[in-house]
C-alpha cells in the first residue's frame, strides 16, 4: 500500500467521523428544541 492510499483512507475516515459527529449534534439539538 502506498503512502498516498493510506493518507486518502485516513482522510476519508476522518471526514466520515466528522459527518457522524455533526449529525449526532444536530439530532441532539433538534430533540432539545422539540422538548421546549
From Swiss-Prot:
Q: Give the location in the cell.
A: Secreted
Expression sites by tissue: Bag cell neurons.
Q: Which residues carry this modification: Lysine amide?
A: 36
Q: Please give the biological process terms from Gene Ontology that the record holds.
A: neuropeptide signaling pathway
**Keyword match Isomerase:** no
Stretches assigned to coiled coil: none
Primary location? secreted
Give the keywords, sorted. Amidation, Hormone, Neuropeptide, Secreted
**One GO cellular component term:** extracellular region
Which GO terms fall under molecular function for this chain's record?
hormone activity
Q: So which domain of life are we looking at?
A: Eukaryota
| Free-text function comment from the UniProt entry | ELH acts as a neurotransmitter locally, upon neurons of the abdominal ganglion and as a hormone by diffusing into the circulating hemolymph and modulating the activity of other organs. It specifically causes contraction of smooth muscle in the ovotestis and expulsion of the egg string.
| Similarity remark | Belongs to the molluscan ELH family.
Protein name, UniProt field: Egg-laying hormone
What organism is recorded for this protein? Answer: Aplysia fasciata
Amino acid at each position: 500500500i502506498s503512502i498516498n492510499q493510506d493518507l486518502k483512507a485516513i482522510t476519508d475516515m476522518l471526514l466520515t467521523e466528522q459527518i457522524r459527529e455533526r449529525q449526532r449534534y444536530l439530532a441532539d439539538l433538534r430533540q432539545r428544541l422539540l422538548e421546549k
